[in-house]
Every structure is written in structure tokens, then in C-alpha cells.
Amino acid sequence: MIKRFLSWWRGEVQPLKRMPETYEEAVQYVYERISPDTVSHPMFHFTGGMAVRNGLGLWDRESKLHQHMLKRFGLCHADDTGMLITNAAHARKNGENYDPWPDVDRCCDHWERAGYDPRTMEKVD
């Protein structure tokens, strides 16, 4: 089942000419590669989120996209930034607007309550 939902991401889709460096470029990249059927399935946000996070290098703290997401949203965790990209592409595919800031606030609140700085993921005393 997971293979089915990751098929949109595989290399045969279209190799990257260059890695997206901004939120908008990443959203556009994902948007162009997903179908309405894919985004409407609940597994998309799990498997699709993993594919976005890993495929766009969101774990690489030196990548331009990671640095952009940190500067723009104050988040460094790849699951959080991947969720923003995935949610935006999903909304766009459905002809809806997406405001990332409520999700950003929710992520920041989660990490702060857990005792971590969402910008660095370092433990805060």
C-alpha cells in the first residue's frame, strides 16, 4: 500500500534539474507531481510527507531549502517543514488557499511544551 502512495515521488516521474530552494519552489514541485486522488487519501500525508522530507533534503541543515524554511518559519524539524510543503500542495491541488502560520504556531507550541527550541531542536532548560 505504501508503495502505491510513494509512486508519485519516484525518480521516473521527472528527475530534479535543481533542488527547490524556497517554500514556493518546493510546493510547486510537489503540486506538479501529485494527483487529486493521491492527496485525498489519508496515507498521502504520512507517506507523502516522508517522501517530501527525505526527497527534498529537509534533514540536511546545510541545504538551501532547510535554511529558507528555518529563516521564514522558525522551524528546523524536517517533519514540520515537510508538513507545511505537503499541506500547501494539497490545498493548492484542491483549489484552496493555505495559510501555514496556524500550523507553524502549532509546531512551535508542541516543541516548546516538550522543552525544545523549534529553531534548533536543542533541549531548553
Model regions and ranges:
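Intrinsically disordered, low-complexity regions enriched in Ser/Pro/Gly/Gln/His and often acidic
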Residues: 1-2, 104
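Compact alpha-helical subdomains of small soluble proteins
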Residues: 37-124
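N-terminal low-complexity, intrinsically disordered segments
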Residues: 2-47, 60-63, 70
